[in-house]
């Protein structure tokens, strides 16, 4: 581990919010004062014991952290190779990792005197988490969600409305996460005085990528001590996590970036296959650098620089970009990024249900599909830790449709 910080992977971003050539702060003049105020408030909060005391209390008593690190015995035996551990963040309150970050941002919003919270959501988990925390603190909540995602994630739409949130279906573009984020940014520009934008992933203008990463890093910090307890002080050999924007992955990866023995693998949504048809959301595998939603990163785009829609069975991975820190880790070679198709994710989903009695969300099913590929090729003392970042209740209708199961029976 780099202790002097000179050769550390954990010191970014710089003062301009850049990770190498990625990141930054590409926003309108209207938003810049709010962004700078948010950065100042967060920098102060990072060193404020009262802020972290409140976070720790809510993580423990409201979210239910620490989430378990579970050895998957039947999956390990079935694959016949590496030992597989699942970080059970789907057991958090609201059913995913998203609430880890939402709590931090909304505590900051309250400190800034904001009374209205807006958010974007794809799979609906960030929207549910935001609506949940707003209900707890008595704040107005508006969630932008692509119309296509509203249809395929109906259970989460109902949950958000039960929690008091206004859900705004976005019909522009293909009606997915990118379009929801576009409309949320338009709302923010119009209502800067009383509104706080709670971004759900490690994207957006600085300080969001670093701030969301810091809140999600509770995942990796827990894994360090939990695995040490279960495996006599060992570190994981390989970390695997699914990536849309990349917050659950960054939360798992970041505490291990300066441990060179730990292999780090991010799994993107390969959709119908990563080829010239661009029916996928694998930004690092099939994209190139550009600017979207306030930061420079790898994006799916055409020859003229127009952002492409992408495709994935998973609403939470259906995003044509990726967090800038992931782009930097990709280019430096510290992390590797692969893609998994819809069909492979569906197979992994079913195997996890059958062998471990865990119904995963389609997002971590992509990560699990990669684990299924690599585990048999690794020795039995090799330890893989995969982040089970969400539960699959929200996806049962989508999976049933693809498997040809009639839900009306």
UniProtKB/Swiss-Prot annotation:
Entry keyword set: Amino-acid biosynthesis, Aromatic amino acid biosynthesis, Lyase, Pyridoxal phosphate, Tryptophan biosynthesis
GO CC field: cytoplasm
Gene3D superfamilies: 3.40.50.1100
EC number: 4.2.1.20
Family indicated by similarity: Belongs to the TrpB family.
Known function: The beta subunit is responsible for the synthesis of L-tryptophan from indole and L-serine.
Record protein name field: Tryptophan synthase beta chain
Lineage: Bacteria, Pseudomonadati, Pseudomonadota, Alphaproteobacteria, Rhodobacterales
Gene: trpB
């Amino acid at each position: 581990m780099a202790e002097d910080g000179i050769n550390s992977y954990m010191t970014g971003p710089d003062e301009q919010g850049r990770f190498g050539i990625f990141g930054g702060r590409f926003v309108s003049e209207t938003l810049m004062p709010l962004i700078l105020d948010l950065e100042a408030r967060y920098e102060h909060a990072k060193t404020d014991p009262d802020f972290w005391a409140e976070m720790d209390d809510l993580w423990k008593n409201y979210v239910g952290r620490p989430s378990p690190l579970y050895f998957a015995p039947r999956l390990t035996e079935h694959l016949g190779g590496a030992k597989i551990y699942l970080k059970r963040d789907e057991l958090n309150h609201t059913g995913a990792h998203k609430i880890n970050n939402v709590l931090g941002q909304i505590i900051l919003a309250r400190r800034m005197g904001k009374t209205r919270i807006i958010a974007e959501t794809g799979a609906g988990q960030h929207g549910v988490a935001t609506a949940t925390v707003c209900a707890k603190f008595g704040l107005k909540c508006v969630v932008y969600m692509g119309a296509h995602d509203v249809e395929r994630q109906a259970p989460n739409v109902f949950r958000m409305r039960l929690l008091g949130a206004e859900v705004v279906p976005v019909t522009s573009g293909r009606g997915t996460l990118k379009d929801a984020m576009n409309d949320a940014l338009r709302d923010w520009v119009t209502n800067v005085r009383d509104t706080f934008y709670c971004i759900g992933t490690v994207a957006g203008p600085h300080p969001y990528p670093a701030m969301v990463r810091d809140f999600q890093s509770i995942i990796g910090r827990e894994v360090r001590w939990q695995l040490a307890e279960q495996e006599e002080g060992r570190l994981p050999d390989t970390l695997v996590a699914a990536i849309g924007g990349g917050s659950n992955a960054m939360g798992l990866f970041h505490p291990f970036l300066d441990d060179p023995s730990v292999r780090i693998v991010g799994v993107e949504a390969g959709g119908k296959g990563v080829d010239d048809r661009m029916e996928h959301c694998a930004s690092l595998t099939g994209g190139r650098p550009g600017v979207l939603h306030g930061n420079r990163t790898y994006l799916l785009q055409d020859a003229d620089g127009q952002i492409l829609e992408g495709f994935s069975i998973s609403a939470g991975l259906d995003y044509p970009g990726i967090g800038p820190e992931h782009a930097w880790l990709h280019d430096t070679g510290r992390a590797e990024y692969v893609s998994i198709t819809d069909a492979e994710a569906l197979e992994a989903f079913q195997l996890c249900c059958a062998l471990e009695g865990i119904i995963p969300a389609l997002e971590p099913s992509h990560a699990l599909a990669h684990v299924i590929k690599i585990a048999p090729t690794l020795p039995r003392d090799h330890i893989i830790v995969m982040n089970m970042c969400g539960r699959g209740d929200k996806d049962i209708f989508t999976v049933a449709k693809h498997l040809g199961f009639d839900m009306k029976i």
